[in-house]
């Protein structure tokens, strides 16, 4: 172990630092350590330039670092503490606690760069993960041990949806959850921490967090690109410990995978690589694969991951979201046109897909209802041009009925969220899969053609829609 191998800083380019060693060069991905005043700065070796110099990425701000400063090779990659001691704590990319509650009580550390499980170790599941969110459970159901992506542009509700999933799944789920905040708002990270304390998912005692169910790993928007490009790996290492050593079913939430790619592009440019399409790093697919292939279920335990993925300029063909599509089992696409109608969650029922929408997994009835709902919505979509030009009166009676049902279905896909109660004033609802399938089946069959459209907006089950219709009638 080359722990006493010491070099000197020769060049500083923002987040990228060149270090010259007289002796042996450190390996790629090794951690280097230097002091800036009274703080320690960790760097990660990214390139070897010539015989004596390495180029490293800083995991924190390089303000105050000077040429000639001593840099020590730690002889190993960056490691993070793992195990029950991380639960209830907030860590940064290098595993240091940032919640001002003292050191982390961990018996073990894991490298943030680990091999993905081999083909023989992997295991597949065909069990549905119930989210309590109607549009998701009906049209693009999630699998236990699967990978789920929430795609959406700026401000269409990805973070609120991921927080609702944490609320509905993590609280009901007996196991452990890990949340990686990658390049998102610090305020949201803080809010999430306090919400989890209020919900009892994090239990804060005197110098202890015993009984907590979630570990938080943050590298937020204000961090340098090195930290944002690695923090998802740090969170994943903590999740892998619970999967591999304790055989648990772990929930792994990432907000936001796009920021991981964005940070990779920033670092890549600083390292002098020639960018590929739209200015992304040439190693985009490799970087994404290295992260995503580790998020999987094995014979020992499972990792179910929910990843928010920002879509730049609402363009799903942008290389960053397009690369992540290939790795996912279910995609929930949020659409600005739907959010503009005031329908939340703004999930696009025709764009969202799931591998598990299969009669062998969800059952014949669920599959048929989901396909009928999609057919009605697709017909409505294709009729919209005619309606815009000629108006509703020019449609056949059958088409008029289809449009009326489609508009009701569209509104019925909205529902009040628990985490949005403070904004909406409506109490959140959790709808079981049975109620979801039954309610949509009744709308498709025309049993509720007599109800006004407004009755279907922001309700839970079809019974709630009936009650709302009566209340609207009484008001009128």
Curated annotation (Swiss-Prot):
One of its GO terms (molecular function) is ATP hydrolysis activity. It is a peripheral membrane protein. It catalyses: ATP + H2O + 4 H(+)(in) = ADP + phosphate + 5 H(+)(out). InterPro entries: AAA+_ATPase, ATP-synt_VA_C, ATP_synth_F1_bsu, ATPase_a/bsu_AS, ATPase_alpha/beta_chains, ATPase_F1/V1/A1_a/bsu_N, ATPase_F1/V1/A1_a/bsu_N_sf, ATPase_F1/V1/A1_a/bsu_nucl-bd. ATP binds at residues 152-159. Its EC number is 7.1.2.2. One of its GO terms (cellular component) is proton-transporting ATP synthase complex. It is found in: Cell inner membrane. NCBIfam families: atpD. Produces ATP from ADP in the presence of a proton gradient across the membrane. The catalytic sites are hosted primarily by the beta subunits. Belongs to the ATPase alpha/beta chains family. HAMAP family: ATP_synth_beta_bact. F-type ATPases have 2 components, CF(1) - the catalytic core - and CF(0) - the membrane proton channel. CF(1) has five subunits: alpha(3), beta(3), gamma(1), delta(1), epsilon(1). CF(0) has three main subunits: a(1), b(2) and c(9-12). The alpha and beta chains form an alternating ring which encloses part of the gamma chain. CF(1) is attached to CF(0) by a central stalk formed by the gamma and epsilon chains, while a peripheral stalk is formed by the delta and b chains. This is ATP synthase subunit beta. It comes from Granulibacter bethesdensis (strain ATCC BAA-1260 / CGDNIH1). The lineage of its organism: Bacteria, Pseudomonadati, Pseudomonadota, Alphaproteobacteria, Acetobacterales.
């Amino acid at each position: 172990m080359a722990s006493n191998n010491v070099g000197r800083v020769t060049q500083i380019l923002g987040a990228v630092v060149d270090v010259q060693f007289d002796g042996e060069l450190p390996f790629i991905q090794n951690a280097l350590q230097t002091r800036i005043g009274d703080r320690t700065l960790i760097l990660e070796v990214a390139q070897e330039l010539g015989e004596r110099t390495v180029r490293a990425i800083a995991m924190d701000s390089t303000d105050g670092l000077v040429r000639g400063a001593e840099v020590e090779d730690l002889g190993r990659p960056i490691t993070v503490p793992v195990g029950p001691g991380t639960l209830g704590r907030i860590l940064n990319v290098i595993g240091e606690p940032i919640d001002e509650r003292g050191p982390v009580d961990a018996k073990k550390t894991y490298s943030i760069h680990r091999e993905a499980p081999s083909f023989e170790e992997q295991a597949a599941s065909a069990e549905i993960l119930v989210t309590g969110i109607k549009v998701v459970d009906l049209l693009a159901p999630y699998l236990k041990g699967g990978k789920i992506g929430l795609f959406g542009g700026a401000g269409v509700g990805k973070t609120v949806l991921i927080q609702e999933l944490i609320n509905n799944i993590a609280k009901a789920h007996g196991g452990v959850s890990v949340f990686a905040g990658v390049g998102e708002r610090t305020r949201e990270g803080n809010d999430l921490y306090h919400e989890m304390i209020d919900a009892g998912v994090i239990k804060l005692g005197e110098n202890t967090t015993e009984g907590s169910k979630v570990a938080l790993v943050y590298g937020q928007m204000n961090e340098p690109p090195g930290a944002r490009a690695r923090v998802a790996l740090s969170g994943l290492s903590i999740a892998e410990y619970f999967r591999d050593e304790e055989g648990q079913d772990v929930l792994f939430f990432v907000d936001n995978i796009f920021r991981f790619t964005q940070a990779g592009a920033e670092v890549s440019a600083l390292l002098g690589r020639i960018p590929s399409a739209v200015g992304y790093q040439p190693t985009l697919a490799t970087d994404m694969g290295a992260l995503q292939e580790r998020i999987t279920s094995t014979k020992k335990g499972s990792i179910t991951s929910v990843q928010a993925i920002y879509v730049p300029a609402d363009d799903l063909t942008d290389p960053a979201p397009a690369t992540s599509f290939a790795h996912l089992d279910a995609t929930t696409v949020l659409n600005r046109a739907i959010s503009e109608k005031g329908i939340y969650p703004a999930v696009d029922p025709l764009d969202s897909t799931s591998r598990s929408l299969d009669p062998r997994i969800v059952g014949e009835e669920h599959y048929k209802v989901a396909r009928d709902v999609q057919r009605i919505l697709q017909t409505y979509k294709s009729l919209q041009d005619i309606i815009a030009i000629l108006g509703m009166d020019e449609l056949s009676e059958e088409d008029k009925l289809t449009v009326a049902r489609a508009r009701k279905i569209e509104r019925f896909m909205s529902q009040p969220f628990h985490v949005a109660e403070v904004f909406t004033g409506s109490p959140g609802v959790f709808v079981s899969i049975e109620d979801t399938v039954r309610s949509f089946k009744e709308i498709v069959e025309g049993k509720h053609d007599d109800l006004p459209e407004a009755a279907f907006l922001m309700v839970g089950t079809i019974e709630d829609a009936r009650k709302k219709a009566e209340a609207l009638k009484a008001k009128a």
